[in-house]
Amino acid sequence: MPPRRSRERLKAISRILLDTATDAGAPGVDAVYGAGILNVEKAMQAQAPASSFVAADAVLTRFSSLTTSAPFGGSAAAAALSGQVGGMTVFDRYGRDFTMTASTGVRARSSGLLAGAMLAPTDAPWRAAQAEAARFGFATNVGAQAMRRPDVPAVVSFSPVAGQQVTLGTNVAVGGGNGLAGSALRGIASLPVGGMSAWSAGGWSASLSSGTSRDGRLRQQVIGFATPLGFGLELSDLAERGQVLGMRGDAALGLSGGRTTLATLTYRRTLVGVDLTARATASSTRAHGGSNLLRFDGPLIGSAFSLEGARELFGGRATLGLSSTLRVERARAVLLAPVSFDLVTGALSTRAVAVDLAPNDRELDLELGWSTALSRTSLFRVGIARAFDAGHVAGASDTAAFVTIAIR
């Protein structure tokens, strides 16, 4: 190293050591620093006004103001994104560079088996419409107590002509399941509740349902068809407000919502006394809004599936199911990531990063349940579920169980 450069570097080091020295008394020989004690630990830290560090942390917080959801991989996606946008290089007043990380990184929403409302508000058997309870050709569960319980599902059925049946309902779960595993949309929003109408005749059936989640962020409409051969098709339209498949951000990200179309093929068949139901779902999502901080490049493609078997057992009905919630298969996006920040001038440099937010693993849920009517006016349900690679995160697991006793 040339002597001149060595002298300049030694002078800079001396300046830093003197500026960061601990004042230990009244001024002595040196009228400025007095009797001081060198503080090497402090000298090794970035030196700038306290407000500069607050400003730098605010910059990182703005870039990290994202909350991921289960379809994107939950906590695994949050960790990966934090590595991209949760840190940067800062320069202090002496031109030295340091690495700084955000005080709050990218967060992940809960997506466990108890997230949302997995236990759909199904109607008890004694409240379901029965043909023998028909009044003027109608069968209904709407009675004198319905006015006192406006949140209870109400169903009315009637037969317009022989061999056909029409069912109308309100306060019913839309797109949900009967157990802990719930619907394919678990982890995106709470279970939508709304109205439904269905028609069936000779093995053919058609249905239409529409509902809104409790927080008002999600509205789902479902049209379903089924044939006598057991094959069926469901088309769903999912409108989200302020989120995209459950992913949320603050105003700076500009995610105003998303629109998802889901197509589900269903197959039902009874084999050796076991009622089998299989479902395979494909989805396409268009994100609305966005900003230079986060912009999706094209549609988000996802998939889900479930397989369930049910049969009479021990005087009740036992179910065993294997399912996987909605998982994003392709989600290409462009992120704006911070690179460096000058603590003195406030100058910020950034770079664009292309990422695919699709997770590498898939959650599998195994569920066992059993239910029986204890009497004409009481129902008992019990179930347990185990999630492997929960939230589409490798090695993560979740276990949940429920016991329900309903007495009228």
Feature-to-residue mapping (PLM):
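Outer membrane beta-barrel translocator domains of Type V secretion systems
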Residues: 109-271, 281-282
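Hydrolase catalytic cores
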Residues: 1-33
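Secreted peptidase-domain scaffold signal
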Residues: 43-132
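Outer membrane beta-barrel transmembrane domains
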Residues: 178-179, 183-187, 193-195, 207, ...
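Caspase-like cysteine protease fold
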Residues: 27-50
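Outer-membrane beta-barrel "beta-signal"
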Residues: 313, 396-408
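Hydrophobic alpha-helix feature that most strongly marks membrane-spanning transmembrane helices
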Residues: 22, 270-272, 312, 375, ...
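Surface-exposed loop and membrane-interface regions of Gram-negative outer-membrane beta-barrel proteins
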Residues: 390-392
